Every structure is written in C-alpha cells, then in structure tokens.
Amino acid sequence: MLNIRLFIFALFASLAAAPAVAQEAQTLDEKVNAAFAAATGPFVNFIFAPFPGTIFPWIVMWLVVGATIFTLYFGFVQFKFFGHAIALVKGDYSDPNDAGEVSHFQALATALSGTVGLGNIAGVAVAVGIGGPGATFWMILAGLMGMASKFTECTLGVKYRNEYPDGTVSGGPMYYMKKGFEELGLPGGKFLAILFSIFCILGSLGGGNMFQANQAHAQIVNITGEFPGWITGVIFAGIVFAVIVGGVKSIARVTEKIVPFMGILYVGAALVVLIVEYDKIGWAFGQIFEGAFSGLGVAGGLVGALIQGFKRAAFSNEAGVGSAAIAHSAVRTKEPITEGFVSLLEPFIDTVVICTMTALVITISGQLITDPETGRFVLNEAGTAITTIDGNTGVALTSAAFATAFSWFPYVLAVAVILFAFSTMISWSYYGLKAWTYLFGEGKAQELTFKIIFCVFIVIGAAASLGPVIDFSDAAIFAMAVVNITALYFLMRVVRGELTSYSSRMKKGEIRKYVG
C-alpha cells in the first residue's frame, strides 16, 4: 500500500507541475505536453479505441451493454418503480433518525450536480452536429437504459457503506468491491477497489476539476473580454473550498439549492426558444425519428447517429461509472434499495430531459444548414459533420441556437455554464475525497490535504493550457466504468435479493410512509 501511495503522490505532482512549468516558455510547454502525451497516450488510445471491426468506441459499448443487461436482469426496474422513486425524493418514506448524513433529495441533487454540466450543452451540440437530430433518439434510449445501471451501483453503495460513530459515512464502489466480494467469497475485490480509487482521484482532478475551471473561465472571458485565468482560478478555488471544507452536508446544502435553480434556468430558457419556434416542434421531432432510423444526410449515416447518441448519453449521465454511488451512499436510510430507486432518476433528468431540450433547441433554431431542394443536411467537405451557420460547434453552436429567440440569451447560457462547472467541481471533489481517504485512511488531516490539492488544481485548470492532461483524466473516468461494471456483474445478484425482498414487503403493505 505504501508503494501505491508514493506512486499516487508522484503522479499528482507531475500533473500539477506540467501546466505550471509550461507557463515559463512556449518551447518548454511543447516539450512537457509532448512528454506527457507520449507517456499517457497508449492508455488514452486504449480506453477510447473502437471495437474491432467497427467505428463504435468499445468503452461506450461496454456501458450500453451493461445498462441493457441490468435493465433485463431487474425486469425494467426503472419503469416499474419510477413513481415510487419520486415519492422517496419527496420524503414520503424518509425517517430522519435513520443512519446517514443527507436526505434522498440532497443525495440526488449532489449526484446530479456532478453529471449535469458541460456535456449537456457542448457535448449534445457535438453529437447533433455530427449525427444529426437522429442522435437524440439514441441518446434518449441510452439514457433510459442507463437508469438501471445507476440503480444497481447506488443500491450497492448504500448496502456496503461504512457507518461511523460520529454519524458520518463513507461508501461507493471501492467499498462494495472490497466488502461485497469478501461477503460472497470472491477474490480480487480489494485490488479492484484500489484500482477504482486511483482512477477516481485522477478523474476528479481532471475532468471533474481542471476542465470545468478552464471552460468556466472561457465563458467569463466571452462576457467580460480579456480576464486573467489565474484570478478566475483563485476566485473559484476560494468559493469551492468554502463549500467543500464543511463536508458532504455542506455540499448537499449548496447543491439542493443550486441544482434546481440551474435546471430551471436552463430548461426555462430552452422552453422560451421552443415556444417562440413552436411551429417547428413537430418538424423537429420528425427529424429526430427519421434521422434515428434512416441516417440520411448525416455524417456516418444511421450508424453515425446511433454512435453519437449513445456516446453522448454515456459521457453525460455517467451511468455505470460508479461516481454517483459515492454521493448516494451518504443518504439517511435503512433500506439500501430505496436509494437505488432515487438514483435512477438521474439519467432521466440529465439525458432524457436536459440533453433532449438542448438537441431540440439546436434542431429548430436553423443553425444546421439544409439543402433547400432535398431538405437534407449539408455536410462539410470532409463529410465528417453537418455544416452550421458561421461554422459554430460545441458551446458556440448551442449559444447561437439560443440567440435565435433573444439576442441576450447567450449571457443566460454563459451563467448556466459557469453554474454547471461550479456544481460539477464540488461534487467531484467529494468523489475524489472518498477515493483518497479509502487509500490513505480516514481523518481530518487526510481530508484537508486532498481538499487543498483539489483547489490548487482549480487554479491550474483555469490558468493553463491543458491538452493531454484532460485527455488522460477523461480516460481515467471511463476506466472507472471498466472496473465498476465488472464488479456489478458479480454483485448484481445481491441487488436482486434486495429488490425481491422490498417488492414483497411493499405488496404486503409493510413499506409505509413515514409519519413523524
């Protein structure tokens, strides 16, 4: 374990030093980036490589196949218990005396704040820009199936969590890998837990931190003009530290307010655009269904639309990655399965609602150029993407789409992006923290050490050119899914036992609403 700890410290030091040292000279910047890319490139290429004989990334296929298996294994649990999940979030069955630190709603808000982010804005724009509106259909389908993955991992997160005398808890994939495998007499659980924790820490510092700070700074620059990145980083680091220093209860108090606000802000803005362009909504849905099954006039045809939809859903809602199980494990409950029900709402809100709203706005806005004679989308010269007005992609495409309703809407979008980035950072700080304390032990000193490291990386992310560092951290996040889903296959029978027991007691009337 000591060697692992030394390795992790050395790796973090190199990650922090690379962008910082690169500020001294452009030639040194290039050398550092090239060296880091050469060292991490094989790992990144492996994670995002296509499945043999196809153009479908194997990691996306891994997530989709897992979601499909869990959907079938648990008898479409995401549809059968959807209503019950809403009742749980409302607090109808919540006993405040149960072990745990946060309510069902707070746990859901914390997990949602980690998934609802730039992927819903920039990622969907990329998916629709390449795969056309038809990608939206496959995105929704993947989101619906991903609900079963969230249900599985979050049930296990609560079942195998550690509960401490002071009322705090620690849970997540690393705990159910170790304790669950031991309970079933299976080998390898401890190894999987360590591997998952390493990937989780790397992902939290990269994709859950530096990338978010970098993109938030870009939006601030768009609004104000030139603005020093390090100042943005210091401001964000100070605000984030003020929130995370209080632990998961502090994070939950913030996310339970900011998540509904930013969700209403973004969805409300999208609804305004849809109302203004109401006469095009029917046409937009027609484009979605036609594009999903014909794929005509889009890059890659039908397969291209399917790949982009599945990829965006997987990258956006993180179903199967295991991160959400860390947040949900802090819930106050004596029934692990109840938090599994609550968690299945995440992919629905993130992908089926918010991502779909983004796709609809882009589709009806007229930003995707069509041939007036055929009505088909016009591809670029390389045939790799749909031509857009002014050549916009990513956040710029979504911003331009919103601006078709009101010219000042891009400012609303910029605020939404900044809020999404902030909420993602505070949630991923908790994920990384729990992985850190799993490896280095529980304690205030260990927790403070990670929180300081996390905030330092915020400044680096806002001020530096990230390049290969972000590619590596993104790969680390999806490497979490490889480890996590492997464990879920071995432990899903435990979840089915919990589901069978709870369903039986519900039918007998033994599961009653809480009356204080």
Where are these predicted regions, by residue range?
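Helix-loop-helix module between adjacent transmembrane segments
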Residues: 70-71, 113, 142-169, 178-214, ...
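Extracellular/periplasmic helix-exit of transmembrane alpha-helices
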Residues: 153-166, 270-287, 300, 330-333, ...
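Transmembrane alpha-helical segments of multi-pass small-molecule transport proteins
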Residues: 60-65, 140, 190-198, 222-246, ...
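N-terminal alpha-helical transmembrane segments of multi-pass membrane transport
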Residues: 2-118, 128-133, 146, 489-516
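Flexible loop linkers connecting adjacent transmembrane helices
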Residues: 76-104, 126-128, 132-136, 148-187, ...
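Membrane-interface loop-to-helix entry segments
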Residues: 3, 65, 73-86, 196, ...
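Extracellular loop-to-transmembrane helix junctions
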Residues: 52-81, 129-167, 355-357, 409, ...
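Alpha-helical membrane segments and immediately flanking helix-loop junctions
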Residues: 97-130, 156-159, 165-180, 195, ...
